[in-house]
């Protein structure tokens, strides 16, 4: 292909993604676009085609990214090359979204005609604006009885500040308006900039592990060209590999001779570890490298930690294998072995957020058939000690004694809640209970309000989302971003059973709520732990101070049953003997803690 042909081809390329809140019809719209452009026959079509994981289909969410090349013959008679890059919509995967948006020049903003703009839509729109994308608003589900496209059009203009006068009215389900969307992509999305003669610069926006071919990196060529046989270099870590294959997804992987500037496709190079192809990194040629990497790359750090333990301890090695396999596809997952006196051998795992944690747990239970016990999630605390040093604590059991702690800092997030104005009071009350600081509130229109609070992340990881949904009858949408660390009066609370600490039940709590939480958890554990042959005291303690106590009464046999009448001293002797036996049992007896007891910590606030 000569230079003019390359330039002409580049002018015909359109790279775009679809951004939407969960359930606003993103994956359905992607399906319709695939069908309309003839990428698939009707027979091959199945719903949510780009969501390849069972879990994605069931929950109706997109977790891993997918990119497809499509050919579209426009009304002007020319054939255009479309690259549709699917993005996850959930807050936990914000970094993946930002990188996949960086691979595009345009974004289709899908808004539900009945529900209007939601918090996560807004978060993703701001990411798109940060990447200077051309945004095309689409009002979807116009065939719903509750649809009100004009209200939503006004909302897009007022809340986001986008001109929505020519927003396409569509119904992805019944195929209305799909052609208008495709024509708008041709007209409004800019062609890719970039120079085929410059040294190679390719952005990695996703990577998956294949057992036979190693890592398959999804890339967008920003400058230059790449083909099989090239020796490439990763700019973040300097590692070099030889390319074995390049190609595009259409939607199945189709090998090509080369990928040119503007193309979105995949590359394999016998890379053994997904950690070597980090999302956001830049690939260049080893013998003719680019001078500087594309900006925006950062290493993902987990925000939430929890312990995963196999219920059957013989499956410990299977759990290690399962985590290693999941880590191949998920560079944000981190884990290390840990032991607990109560739960045996297991792993301390780090996740991007709560949804990420739930998905990993479900995948281990489903795909690898391992039943898990999970400990309460915790966040990363920065602890300043009296000797002037600092430590990082992600497991409550590792928190030092109060005497050596100068101060403890915890992560805060900026939480944006969008809610109908009838529920403003309920949301504000919930945020206050979670130690939130009110920042702003604005009315989006006459029925919906956006409320912004600063809240400690530790308060959100428990059950904030569940409580928000129940207090607003499911109408609220919620989004959060980390803003930094602040000092708080935090203490570690230990739970003692039969005067022994149960390390897996320890948690970190704000001093003002310590007494109340200690009381709730002690009462819950009393209900959940079965009665033993001896009496079991349950105590909640901060350092050496007991803040709450309850006792599980012993099961006892009636030793007097065989004494009919008779001397009182005989009865007393039998009772004393029983008492001695119980005392001995109590010294050597251990208490079985059921799985529900660990979950009780998570659901602590429900009984308030």
Swiss-Prot record:
- What are its GO cellular component terms? plasma membrane
User: What are the recorded GO MF terms, alphabetically?
Assistant: GTP binding; GTPase activity; ribosome binding; translation elongation factor activity
Membrane topology reported for the UniProt record: Peripheral membrane protein
Q: Which reaction does it catalyse?
A: GTP + H2O = GDP + phosphate + H(+)
Q: Where in the cell is it found?
A: Cell membrane
Keyword Membrane part of the UniProt annotation: yes
Alphabetized UniProt keyword annotations: Cell membrane, GTP-binding, Hydrolase, Membrane, Nucleotide-binding, Protein biosynthesis
Q: Which GO terms fall under biological process for this protein?
A: positive regulation of translation
| InterPro entries named among the record's database cross-references | EF-4, EFG_III/V, EFG_V-like, EFTu-like_2, G_TR_CS, LepA_C_sf, LepA_CTD, LepA_IV
**Domain (tr-type G) ranges:** 11-193
Where does the record place a coiled coil?
A: none
- For GTP, which residues are the binding ones? 23-28, 140-143
Which Gene3D superfamilies does the UniProt entry name for this protein?
Answer: 3.30.70.240, Elongation factor 4, C-terminal domain, Elongation Factor G (Translational Gtpase), domain 3, P-loop containing nucleotide triphosphate hydrolases, Translation factors
User: Which HAMAP family does the entry link to?
Assistant: LepA (MF_00071)
Q: Identify its protein family.
A: Belongs to the TRAFAC class translation factor GTPase superfamily. Classic translation factor GTPase family. LepA subfamily.
What exactly does this protein do?
Required for accurate and efficient protein synthesis under certain stress conditions. May act as a fidelity factor of the translation reaction, by catalyzing a one-codon backward translocation of tRNAs on improperly translocated ribosomes. Back-translocation proceeds from a post-translocation (POST) complex to a pre-translocation (PRE) complex, thus giving elongation factor G a second chance to translocate the tRNAs correctly. Binds to ribosomes in a GTP-dependent manner.
Q: What is this protein called?
A: Elongation factor 4
The organism's lineage is: Bacteria, Bacillati, Bacillota, Bacilli, Bacillales
């Amino acid at each position: 292909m000569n230079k003019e042909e390359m330039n002409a081809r580049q002018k015909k390329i359109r790279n775009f993604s679809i951004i939407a809140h969960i359930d606003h019809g993103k994956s359905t719209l992607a399906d319709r676009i695939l069908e309309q452009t003839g990428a698939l026959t009707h027979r091959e079509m199945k719903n949510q085609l780009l969501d390849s994981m069972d879990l994605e289909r069931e929950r109706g969410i997109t977790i891993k990214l997918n990119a497809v090349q499509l050919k579209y013959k426009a009304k002007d008679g020319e054939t255009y090359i479309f690259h549709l890059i699917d993005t996850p919509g959930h807050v936990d995967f914000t970094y993946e979204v930002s990188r996949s948006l960086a691979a595009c020049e345009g974004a289709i903003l899908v808004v539900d005609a009945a529900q209007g703009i939601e918090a996560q839509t807004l978060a993703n729109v701001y990411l798109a604006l940060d990447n200077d994308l051309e945004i095309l608003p689409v009002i979807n589900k116009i065939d719903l009885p509750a649809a009100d496209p004009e209200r939503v059009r006004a909302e897009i203009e007022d809340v986001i500040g986008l001109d929505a006068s020519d927003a396409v009215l569509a119904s992805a389900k019944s195929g209305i308006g799909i052609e208008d969307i495709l024509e708008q992509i041709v007209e409004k999305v800019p062609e890719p900039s970039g120079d085929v003669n410059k040294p190679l610069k390719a952005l990695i926006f996703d990577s998956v592990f294949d057992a036979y071919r190693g890592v398959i990196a999804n890339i967008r060529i920003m400058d230059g060209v790449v083909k099989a046989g090239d020796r490439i270099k990763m700019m973040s870590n300097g590692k070099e590999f030889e390319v074995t294959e390049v190609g595009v997804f259409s939607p199945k992987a189709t090998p090509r001779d080369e990928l040119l500037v503007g193309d979105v496709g995949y590359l394999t190079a016998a890379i053994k570890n997904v950690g070597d192809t980090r999302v956001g990194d830049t690939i260049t040629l080893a013998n003719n490298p680019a001078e500087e990497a594309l900006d925006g790359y950062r290493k993902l750090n987990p925000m939430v930690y929890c312990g995963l333990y196999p219920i059957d301890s013989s499956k410990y090695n299977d759990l290690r294998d399962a985590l290693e396999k999941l880590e191949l596809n998920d560079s944000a997952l981190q884990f290390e072995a840990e032991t607990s006196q109560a739960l045996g051998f297991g792993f301390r795992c780090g996740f991007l957020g709560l949804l990420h944690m739930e998905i990993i747990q479900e995948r281990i239970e489903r795909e690898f058939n391992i039943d898990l016990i999970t400990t309460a999630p915790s966040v990363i605390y920065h602890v300043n000690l009296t000797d002037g040093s600092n430590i990082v604590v992600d497991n409550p059991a590792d928190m030092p004694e109060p005497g050596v702690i100068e101060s403890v800092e915890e992560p805060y997030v900026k939480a944006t809640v969008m809610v109908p104005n009838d529920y403003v009071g309920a949301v504000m009350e919930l945020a206050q209970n979670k130690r939130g600081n009110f920042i702003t509130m604005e009315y989006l229109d006459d029925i919906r309000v956006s409320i912004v609070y600063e809240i400690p992340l530790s308060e959100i990881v428990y059950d904030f989302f569940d409580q928000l949904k129940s207090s607003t009858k499911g109408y609220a949408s919620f989004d959060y971003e980390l803003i930094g660390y602040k000092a708080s009066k935090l203490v570690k609370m230990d739970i003692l059973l039969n005067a022994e600490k149960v390390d897996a039940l320890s948690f970190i709590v704000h001093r003002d709520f310590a007494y109340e939480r200690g009381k709730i958890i002690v009462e819950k554990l009393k209900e959940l732990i079965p009665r033993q042959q001896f009496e079991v005291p349950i105590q909640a303690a901060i350092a050496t101070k007991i803040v709450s106590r309850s006792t599980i009464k012993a099961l006892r046999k009636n030793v007097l049953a065989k004494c009919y009448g008779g001397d009182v001293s005989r009865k007393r002797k039998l009772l004393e003997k029983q008492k001695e036996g119980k005392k001995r049992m109590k010294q050597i007896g251990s208490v079985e803690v059921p799985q529900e007891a660990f979950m009780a910590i998570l659901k602590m606030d429900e009984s308030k």
